Structures are given as C-alpha cells and as structure tokens.
Curated annotation (Swiss-Prot):
UniProt subcellular location: Mitochondrion inner membrane
The organism of origin for this protein: Gorilla gorilla gorilla (Western lowland gorilla)
Pathway: Energy metabolism; oxidative phosphorylation
CDD domains (UniProt xref): Cyt_c_Oxidase_Va (cd00923)
Matches recorded under PANTHER family: CYTOCHROME C OXIDASE POLYPEPTIDE, CYTOCHROME C OXIDASE SUBUNIT 5A, MITOCHONDRIAL
Record PTM Phosphothreonine, positions in chain: T141
Record's comment on post-translational modification: In response to mitochondrial stress, the precursor protein is ubiquitinated by the SIFI complex in the cytoplasm before mitochondrial import, leading to its degradation. Within the SIFI complex, UBR4 initiates ubiquitin chain that are further elongated or branched by KCMF1.
Transit peptide region: 1-41
Protein name: Cytochrome c oxidase subunit 5A, mitochondrial
Taxonomic superkingdom: Eukaryota
Length: 150
C-alpha cells in the first residue's frame, strides 16, 4: 500500500517536469514549491483513544455477533501494539459469555497478560477492574485455573 502511494507521488512529480526540465525556474517559486510540502503517504484522520475504545466496545456488543466474528475481533485486537482498555475486554468477555465461548475468555485474559509484557503492574490492574464482570459471568482467570503453572 505504501509502495503504491510512493509510486503515485513519483508519477505525479515526473508529469510536472517537461522535456526541458522543470516547468518553473529555480529562482521563481511556483506551484512546485507548494507541491514539495505535500506528504503523499499521509491521508485520513487519526483515530483518538476514545474513538478506538468506542469502536471495539460497539463491535463486541453487537447482538448478532457470531463465534467467527468474535475470534476475528480478538485476533485483530491482539495484533495492536497495546494492552486493550478494561472496558474493551469487558465487552469481549460478555460477548464470549453470550456465545458460550469459555475457551475464548481464557485466551483473552492470557493475551492481556502477554501484551503487558515486562510491566507487571498492568495485568493485576486489568484483573482488578474486571473482577466484578468476572464474578458476574462466572469466569475464572488463568491463574485460578492453574494454567500459569503449566
């Protein structure tokens, strides 16, 4: 995708040059000066953290979500270079419970622990925030199941 954008920029730059070189001399600034400041690779707006969280909570709260969409969402969420907010994890756990996907709940919690990496304070914080949901839904953590000792 980036390669295609760079090719478009290169083609656009070569079409602005005529057979005798650039259309404008170097002494007189013209449209070429404005073109140089355009970033050909950046487009679209950045998603804020709140919009990101809302998008994923909405995704997992869909009433007609099926097991495949649930796993696809979890896999996509895990690929991001961040630990999801507890409210996203809460929505995902509730979707797992609606679909009776207990294995996915354990997988989500294991992924959160893995994504926390060397930051040992993140996973306990997430579990603390999710404890009411875990108790309500009857979900055990991997540690409670003894999976951390395997």
């Amino acid at each position: 995708m980036l390669g295609a954008a760079l090719r478009r920029c290169a083609v656009a730059a070569t079409t602005r040059a005529g057979p005798r070189g650039l259309l404008h001399s170097a002494r007189t600034p013209g449209p070429a000066a404005a073109i140089q400041s355009v970033r050909c690779y950046s487009h679209g707006s950045q998603e804020t953290d709140e919009e990101f969280d809302a998008r994923w909570v909405t995704y997992f709260n869909k009433p007609d979500i099926d097991a495949w969409e649930l796993r696809k969402g979890i896999n996509t969420l895990v690929t991001y270079d961040m630990v999801p907010e507890p409210k996203i994890i809460d929505a995902a756990l509730r979707a797992c419970r609606r679909l009776n996907e207990f294995a996915s709940t354990v997988r989500i919690l294991e992924a959160v622990k893995d994504k926390a990496g060397p930051h040992k304070e993140i996973y306990p914080y997430v579990i603390q925030e999710l404890r009411p949901t875990l108790n309500e839904l009857g979900i055990s953590t991997p540690e409670e199941l003894g999976l951390d000792k395997v």
